[in-house]
């Protein structure tokens, strides 16, 4: 932002913005004195009313080049009474001729000496088919015509830019910020409010004069001369506005027309019109409606207003918002097209991440949001904060798909940063969901079409201690349909939200992913050349899938371990979700030791609080209940809180994969060799990696298991007879504290192995060629629900269909199962081997229960 007294205009000008030419003469002169022709009475009266509210900063300070006796006409960006009065005051302050006193001869054919390129629109958006305003200024056309008629006439145009409240201080009220200057063309009432609130911070910029005569002497046809002069003036106003208030980010106004003008959209409109049997104009309006439905309406004043508002909200409901690893991101991000890809746990993700970026002085991205959030008032505010809305499903709607793709392409080509959630929706279980590659595909294709600016994907982990949507997640996991968002529900829940305390929020920036590096690895045949709009290389889909999984893996590698995560890991390992205080402290201590001594990655952050402080914090936010007892206090979680805690356990489940695997192997076995433990772990790893987005190769996972073994031996959880591969590892036989802690660690992965065994058991029981993948999913879900009822109460996510789907998909990728010509799954004896391996982990009673309840497919009744 330029300093208040610095010149805003470049020293050099275009050929039409010529320096002052003293040659020639003009028969137009200004009145010698304002006493000869006075300003209109209405202007004097209104000026006196407005003067106390205005404090003008005029640039440049010296007006010698304007006040040399030659006739000048001022050019404003748009008409408006307030603008006219401000210009008049600026002219009086600098002793320039008044814009309200016409030139002799009246070349404008109006009683004034100023004109505007455009007028404020008076159209009503509620009235369809209303004609818009003129495409050019009548006054400017009249002025050019007067110069053609009178050869001696040489009026100079002086463009004048007016900014009211361009940069309100941070100490200014948020209401004043809302009415500060931006790129939008505002109405009269809003302009008056802007003057009342920000008029004392008004800037008036006079530009160098433009000779109309020299423009005419270029010899262009009249219509082209008019268009060129208007184009020069518009370019000037835009350049000055960018200098004063920053670039125009109101993409809705700038990008919609560009989207509709692309070749791909025009072709899609033609194809859609042909399919529907409609005319092109009707289909074009349909495409335009799609573009307006999608497009953001970025507003800097609204962003600044939201900062004032949400600073108070966050301080009220959160105990702080911490941001980690942002400095390293700021070092490498310049010069890149940034795509923020955060985890998606809550509706608050949209607001929190934008708030953090704003506070870190990082430009806000354009955020992809589901159309379900386009509610009255809320949707408008989200659009103003940079959100653009897309439909949940676009299959079968080719026109919409093309418009959306081109909109994203325009953003990428324009250098706008993006933000989207590749999980497609909020996680109801606390795990990262399997990624959807649609938005990544659009981003990659947009880059391949115009590979000018390198793309950087920035994974971000957002961690909560308490969720606003916790109750609704419980209902949905229990089988109730998702409630449709409504503005009334939003307003109804605001008082409830403001009364709650939601603990601390942590935002961790993961390791960025450079798209060029991914393409160099997976698509070496691409050499940086631009691809056509409809060109889809064979490697594109596999590259997008790899990129999506890598993003999820990097998000998990930047996890934050907060107090509630540690409590959930400990308490949910017991049948009644309760522990004595001393046992709970010991278990939390062990979990922290595993994380600190066997670091998952250098971007994982861990709460610095002691176990005692963690327990006190959980009691403060009403997650933990203390039951006093003469033999020692018992700490527990009750009812729905226990199910909700599974959400926070799942947030960090992946961090304990290796340690939980080792502990699981000793839950039902007292003795096992190192080599057997590692061999079984490596065999199970592909399924765990697919479900939990783990970063290691199989060899790296084997090394990690070895490190866990050494730690468990040091902690006394396991006993080692030696360091050779064949040397046995043993655990204690009695119910010691070490055995208790080992079993508690194992519990976090127990349910995953139970799901795997359910799937294999149902396949084996039904035989090859009997079940399709979808039929197997449904039977697995039913069996898991029944097991939960009969054997032990579990969280609803235990029978989540998506988890079974992921396991079945991995079986297919490893060729352990494959479809026949009728899409029925086939398998061989290798599946029996996998079932035998499960005997090492699962107890006999549990295996027997699973085998007994595993359902068979319903066979059709004989005819």
Curated annotation (Swiss-Prot):
Q: Which GO terms describe its biological process?
A: CDP-diacylglycerol biosynthetic process; fatty acid metabolic process
Q: Which GO terms describe its cellular component?
A: plasma membrane
From the Swiss-Prot or TrEMBL record, state where the protein is found.
Cell inner membrane
Q: Mind telling me what this protein is named? A: Glycerol-3-phosphate acyltransferase
Q: Look up the record and name the pathway of this protein.
A: Phospholipid metabolism; CDP-diacylglycerol biosynthesis; CDP-diacylglycerol from sn-glycerol 3-phosphate: step 1/3
| Chain ranges for the short sequence motif HXXXXD motif as given in the UniProt record | 344-349
EC code(s) of this entry: 2.3.1.15
By sequence similarity, the record places it as follows: Belongs to the GPAT/DAPAT family.
Cite the record's Polar residues compositional bias ranges: 12-29
Read off the domain note.
The HXXXXD motif is essential for acyltransferase activity and may constitute the binding site for the phosphate moiety of the glycerol-3-phosphate.
The alphabetical list of record keywords is:
Acyltransferase, Cell inner membrane, Cell membrane, Lipid biosynthesis, Lipid metabolism, Membrane, Phospholipid biosynthesis, Phospholipid metabolism, Transferase
Q: What is its main location?
A: membrane
Its encoding gene is what? Answer: plsB
One matching Pfam family is: GPAT_C
Please give the InterPro entries that the UniProt record associates with this protein.
GPAT/DHAPAT (IPR022284), GPAT/DHAPAT_C (IPR045520), GPAT/DHAPAT_LPLAT (IPR041728), GPAT_PlsB (IPR028354), Plipid/glycerol_acylTrfase (IPR002123)
